[in-house]
Amino acid sequence: MSQEVLEDLAKVRNIGIMAHIDAGKTTTTERILFYTGITHKIGEVHDGAAAMDWMAQEQERGITITSAATTCFWGGNQINIIDTPGHVDFTVEVERSLRVLDGAVAVFDGKEGVEPQSETVWRQADKYKVPRICFVNKMDKIGADFHFTVKTVVDRLGATPLVIQLPIGSESTFEGVIDLVEMRALTWRGDAKGDVKMGAEYAVEPIPEDLKQQADEFRQKLIETVAENDEALLEKFFSGEEITVAELKSAIRRLTVSGSLYPILCGSSFKNRGVQPMLDAVVDYLPSPLDVPPVTGVDADNPQERLADVSQPFSALAFKVAVHPFFGRLTYIRVYSGTLPAGSQIVNSTKSRKERFGKVFQMHSNKENPVPKMSAGHIYAVIGLKYTTTGDTLCDQDNPIILESMTFPDPVIEVAIEPKTKADQEKLSLAIQRLAEEDPTFKTEQNPETGQTVIKGMGELHLDILVDRMRREFNVEANVGTPQVAYRETIRRTVEKHEYTHKKQTGGAGQFARVIITLEPLEVTGEKTYDFVDTVTGGRIPKEYIPSVDAGIRDAMQVGVLAGYPTVGIKATLVDGAYHDVDSSEMAFRIAGSQAFKEASRRADPTLLEPIMSVEVRTPDEYMGDVIGDLNSRRGHIQSMQDSSGIKVIQARVPLSEMFGYIGDLRSKTSGRAVYSMTFDGYAEAPKSVTEEVVRKARGE
């Protein structure tokens, strides 16, 4: 089959593989590439040679950090795969890949079931309404339990699973699956070391006698579940007619695409069993670009949509920028509509800049296959885009549209970084600029007082890897400080009608602005941390100056009155004020707004907020007391404790400032047998002792 891009979109699948760390996601992707004939020797993550893990650190750490996009062919269909990382510090990668996928394969560990990170990724996929099929991997592992894993999909994700395969054998005797749709057994029989043919061939057999009864029960359940959700089949089901395989498949497809059900398959990627049927399921049940609702523009006054069709005007979303060793900036884009040859000029409608595409590639991990043009429904990597960053829309100059972008969380941890020599200084700023283009959750700023460069990210591992990349890719030698917590400030009390007058009379034009503001605490939500209300009547402050007061307050909120951290949770009401015909200006009102806020917030009982992390620890029973005692000593609140296949799962909320270096302590307390994961949960008021300590440090006492 030629490697050209398929024009028939019904035969195209854009999918992601999502999972918890170590559920076997990269291995699964490797097997897919092997069976679809792109990689000749299977890369094993165990020896650090997987084709998808192409950054040096990924190969060392055995975890996937960047989502490499890969194209492969299966049975006349084209599958574009985006491999996503499962480590919580890399949520941004998962978030951006889900935004451009049409469907996903959720890989679960057959022994652990749904783990905390699988849950986070699952919720992100819910947010973008991505249809999914589930693959229960590692069925050859000791303690693997298919039915337990299916139960965790119900209990922890609240999803409706649809079991379409059952395992034949388990642990070391796992040798195949029962296909409940076509009622047959698929077996991969090899020698004890695993088949020399890499499991590329499998036998289709009748279902073994000892499993027939179980298979019949599950087949009945499968048909009932599908019929309940699909009217066409419901009538047939009640009238006792035979439902054909084709009818069952198309009903499962409809329900999967609409997100009502999640088909569940099983296998062992490492032992090369069960991967081909999973590829068949990707083609059979996951949506093509034609099954997905058309994309719409975000401009409410001018609603527009684009269908996945080459005859429509061109539109695409940039979802990743990577730095390539030869080509420089490589931008990954998902084309939603239209077609364009390489070298065309387009508009970046998000930034209102003209751009030109250079060469266009379909990627295989980090090898490029050049293609002459881009067309709807596909994923490409392009070079030549100068201004485009993650989340920008690219479109036809005459038919502009802006597509929904992605939301990225604010960083929660920061470290100061200093170049070791003068020569490193320039390299450092280039490295930071390049890395920030690639990763929107990586922020950087100059500390005005110390002149230090501060880098911010989503966790210790995230920053470690970024500093590591600076060293490897940009040869920057730098000293890194200890991690600091990104605190916030807020107010606890309402201050009514605080007045501030800004005036300056020094010959020539003076400056004059009077404002009266009321400050109230505002509940902080993900989207809203500040609200500005204007209740000035009778033109006491001319309309054109009011945005300046708002801007002044925003300026002042950047540096809080307690310890200089950004202020959140403020509702500011501009009640009244006064102006002068000659001396008032936007600048004067901006200064007045800023100073009024500073004075009022000092009176409003300011307090410090600290980031709280949601921590989940999985530990063997005998260490449970130590682990809980340790979490309590870190000011943690234990939320729940559960049993999960011989392991205790502890959920707690712990302040981030207490979690530095936790991994080392946990390892030594549990002889390396416990694991933990941590996600940002929100901000909470810091206790008095912590606030005093932070304020003292900030004031340099």
UniProtKB/Swiss-Prot annotation:
Any one GO molecular-function label of the UniProt entry: GTP binding
Residue stretches making up the tr-type G domain: 10-290
CDD domains reported in the protein's UniProt record: EF-G, EFG_III, EFG_mtEFG1_IV, EFG_mtEFG_C, EFG_mtEFG_II
InterPro entries per UniProt: EF-G-like_DII (IPR053905), EFG_II (IPR041095), EFG_III (IPR009022), EFG_III/V (IPR035647), EFG_IV (IPR047872), EFG_V (IPR035649), EFG_V-like (IPR000640), G_TR_CS (IPR031157)
Residue sites binding GTP per the record: 19-26, 83-87, 137-140
Record's keyword annotation contains Cytoplasm: yes
SUPFAM superfamilies assigned: EF-G C-terminal domain-like (SSF54980), P-loop containing nucleoside triphosphate hydrolases (SSF52540), Ribosomal protein S5 domain 2-like (SSF54211), Translation proteins (SSF50447)
Compartments, record wording: Cytoplasm
Superkingdom of the source species: Bacteria
One GO cellular component, as annotated: cytoplasm
Record keywords, A-Z: Cytoplasm, Elongation factor, GTP-binding, Nucleotide-binding, Protein biosynthesis
A UniProt-annotated Pfam family: EFG_IV
Gene Ontology process terms (BP): ribosome disassembly
General function of this protein: Catalyzes the GTP-dependent ribosomal translocation step during translation elongation. During this step, the ribosome changes from the pre-translocational (PRE) to the post-translocational (POST) state as the newly formed A-site-bound peptidyl-tRNA and P-site-bound deacylated tRNA move to the P and E sites, respectively. Catalyzes the coordinated movement of the two tRNA molecules, the mRNA and conformational changes in the ribosome.
Family the UniProt entry places it in: Belongs to the TRAFAC class translation factor GTPase superfamily. Classic translation factor GTPase family. EF-G/EF-2 subfamily.
PANTHER family given in the database record: RIBOSOME-RELEASING FACTOR 2, MITOCHONDRIAL, TRANSLATION ELONGATION FACTOR G-RELATED
Name of the protein: Elongation factor G
Organism: Tropheryma whipplei (strain Twist)
